[in-house]
Amino acid sequence: MPATLTELTVYPLKSGGGTALSSAELLPTGLRFDREFMLVNPEGRFLSQRDHAAMARLRPAYDGTELTVRADGREPLVHKAVDEGPVRDVTVHRSDCQGVDQGDEAAAWFAGLLDTECRLVRFTGHRPTSRGGGEVAFADGYPLLVISAESLADLNGRLAEPLPMNRFRPSLVIDGLGAFGEDRARRMRIGAGPDAVEIELVKACARCVITTTDQDTGERGREPLRTLATYRTIDRGIRFGQNAVPRVQGTLRVGDPVEVLETA
């Protein structure tokens, strides 16, 4: 059976919940609107589920004009995105970039929810990927994360309780590559005809404590890192999925055929 794109997910707010899509425009920075917003502390350092597990319960949606964020037990935040305003110097890991501050009302909403002082910023400018010669917004280092459905099935076959794909927060899920087939692929074409896109898979994704965080409740456990460590430790890190960079832009659609153009 040919490989097929089965899931598309965008994350408008870094470390917030994902939004499943049936189609998405692929830009140099990844899926349109992906990681366009981010929370930072007073020093400009990004906030994430690594230190604030409650961020898993945030449900953002963004249409290019309004960012709506829902969380259990609170009135939703409906925020009109600000294009111009104070520009803050911010940091994602060791990468310095800038974001437009989105104002006091949004900051207060998130601060009250997370019980920590923070500001909401919107990406502006340019930021290079960690490697591969691409661009990225507020994602950790790469604009896309690709995981095969069979890779998760392989992992779940080793776990006492299966886990959903959202633990790994991929952009693209592909069925038909085989378990860890994404590790063997270097370039893919997704779609057919003039609208087809191409991506280059450039680096295995190192996994962190976020994978142990239930994306519905924010509660943490020991899996999947405990099991992944037994068979997916590569280059002194636990790896699952492949970071990727767009090479040919266009529109992605769930159900698109996937062709591996080049292997490792």
Question: Which residues fall in each region the model found?
Answer:
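Metal-cofactor-dependent catalytic cores
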Residues: 1-264
